Design a protein with these regions (language model features):
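FAD-site-proximal beta/loop scaffold in flavoenzymes
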Residues: 253-287, 372-449
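A structured beta-alpha segment of the ubiquitous adenosine-cofactor-binding alpha/beta core
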Residues: 208-229, 276-282, 345-393
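FAD-binding core/adjacent interface of flavoenzyme oxidoreductases
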Residues: 68, 92-94, 101-152, 213-288, ...
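Long hydrophobic segments that form regular secondary structure
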Residues: 283-320, 380, 388-394, 401-403, ...
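Beta1-alpha1 glycine-rich phosphate/pyrophosphate-binding loop at the start
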Residues: 6-33, 62-74, 83-85, 112, ...
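A conserved FAD-binding loop/helix module that cradles the flavin
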Residues: 302, 445-471
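Short Fe-S-cluster ligation motifs
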Residues: 5-21, 30, 44, 48, ...
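Cysteine-centered iron-sulfur cluster-binding motifs in ferredoxin-type domains/subunits
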Residues: 41-72, 81, 85-119, 153, ...
Length: 472
């Protein structure tokens, strides 16, 4: 078959259409329509099949992107899905939530002049279509080794570890405190980015592969780590980072101030019918003037959730300029379309409260961009005399996350760093092995809060380390 080498000129990049704005703003459903078969084939055909594919190297799991784009263009969906799963445990999830503009698509040779290949949406199409057509991972040639591994945490790192172990004949048993798998994929990422049926289907697939899940089971409460270490040949910790970071602001504990993650988790549990808990109470922003402090993707999740809860007005306040905002440009664009007001170069100084002690606004100061910090990002420097109050009824703090307390881990000789992260070097003889040789760890609890795909990559590498340790 002759190839049109100028296909990227003849056919421009096309993204999937979004649902109508009036529907998006009131529903917790994914806003992007899926590609049709014709759209997926045509967009996949734009790939140049570069000899040195930068997209593949920029991807943390090093997906065989040009290869499965070619298969998608040829309509060979089962083969594309099989190839996709060779490197990625959750390709249909990454196709939805990865910041492709900063990873594969941002590195596409066509990106600057012609528009990158729509890699993420084709990845989603390939795997959704394959599942719809009945494709499932084939483990018929896998021989059981008799080894068993306990995995604590059913988030992306834990699921990735379980996937690789299972494909190599090791029995994986996954423990998680939530009533569904996915961790923050399910309970932290709102349904307008990742519908929850995606993870329900994924649990069915994993169960069919032989992975066992023990949900609503919290280590330290329902099961003890000491018992797991006796019962299993190794233990993997993929517990994430759940402790919200605060800004040290005046009155930040006042009624009406909320941490981002409990707010998002409780909202999702409400939608899924799981109810609320004392540490994650459901909060409705209906009729309220909401201010979300922070500029990352979690902040975008909070402002867009508030819109769908029918907030009266929603502001995202960030201390740097838009260029230095860490959140996905795509998510910022979506939030703007949905009516969110962005205030850049404003530094929160404190929460204002009324006579009843409830939130009535946030005291801000304007900032200007200074010299770069240690990470290369320009510092936000307060402009003297620029203090002002922005009225509001609710404040959500989205300043990031750090490791939560793990008292159940303290007696098991696992070293932590100064920030409370587990020390588990990738470059050790057994990748991601901790100071307790029987315990491995990966994902956010090792590297700090990061992307879904980096957690998947580390979970898979940790599984390789475990296989090496078990000599299987």
């Amino acid at each position: 078959m002759s190839q049109n080498v100028y296909q990227f000129i003849d056919l421009q990049r096309v993204d999937p259409p979004k649902k109508p704005l009036k529907i998006r703003k009131i529903e917790f459903v994914e806003i992007y329509e899926p590609f049709s078969e014709g759209q997926a084939k045509a967009q996949a055909d734009r790939c140049l099949s570069c000899g040195n594919p930068y997209c593949e190297w920029k991807c943390p799991v090093h997906n065989y992107i040009p290869n499965w784009l070619k298969l998608a263009n040829e309509g060979r969906i089962f083969e594309a899905a099989e190839l996709s799963h060779q490197t990625n445990t959750l390709p249909e999830v990454c196709g939805r939530v990865c910041p492709q503009d900063r990873l594969c698509e941002g590195s596409c040779t066509l990106n600057d002049e012609f528009g990158a290949v729509t890699i993420g949406n084709i990845e989603r199409y390939i795997n959704d279509k394959a599942f719809e057509m009945g494709w499932r991972p084939d483990l018929s040639d896998v021989k059981p080794t008799g080894k068993t591994v306990a995995i604590i945490g059913a988030g992306p790192a834990g699921l990735a570890c379980a996937d690789v172990l299972t494909r190599n004949g090791v029995k994986a048993v996954v423990f998680d405190r939530h009533p569904e798998i996915g961790g923050l994929l399910t309970f932290g990422i709102p349904a307008f980015k990742l519908e929850k049926e995606v993870m329900t289907r994924r649990r069915e697939i994993f169960t069919g592969m032989g992975i066992e899940f023990k949900l609503n089971t919290e280590v330290g409460r329902d099961v003890q780590l000491a018992d797991l270490l006796k019962e299993y040949d190794a233990v993997f910790l993929g517990v994430g980072t759940y402790q919200s970071m605060r800004g040290g602001l005046d009155n930040e504990d006042a009624p009406g101030v909320y941490d981002a993650l409990p707010f998002l988790i409780a909202n999702t549990k409400q939608i899924m019918g799981f109810g609320e808990t004392a540490d994650e109470p459901y909060v409705s922003m209906e009729g309220k003037r909401v201010q979300v402090l922070g500029g990352g993707d979690t902040a975008m999740d909070c402002v867009r959730t508030s819109v769908r809860q029918n907030a009266a007005h929603v502001i995202c306040a960030y201390r740097r300029d838009e260029e230095n905002m860490p959140g996905s440009k795509r998510e910022v664009k979506n939030a703007r379309e949905e009516g969110v007001e962005f205030q850049f170069n404003v530094q929160p100084l404190g929460v204002e409260v009324n006579a009843n002690g409830k939130v009535c606004g946030v005291k801000m100061a304007r900032t200007e961009m200074g010299q770069p910090d240690a990470k290369g990002r320009r510092r936000a420097e307060i402009v003297p005399g620029s203090e002002h109050v922005v009225p509001g009824d609710a404040v959500v703090m989205a300043f990031g996350f750090r490791p939560h307390s793990m008292e159940w881990l303290a007696k098991h000789s696992v070293e932590l760093d100064s920030q409370g992260r587990i020390i588990a070097p990738e470059g050790s003889e057994n990748a991601f092995q901790t100071s307790n040789p029987k315990i491995f760890a990966g994902g956010d609890i090792v590297r700090g809060s990061d992307l879904v795909v980096t957690a998947i990559a580390e979970g898979r590498k940790a599984a390789d380390g475990i296989l090496n340790y078990l000599e299987v």
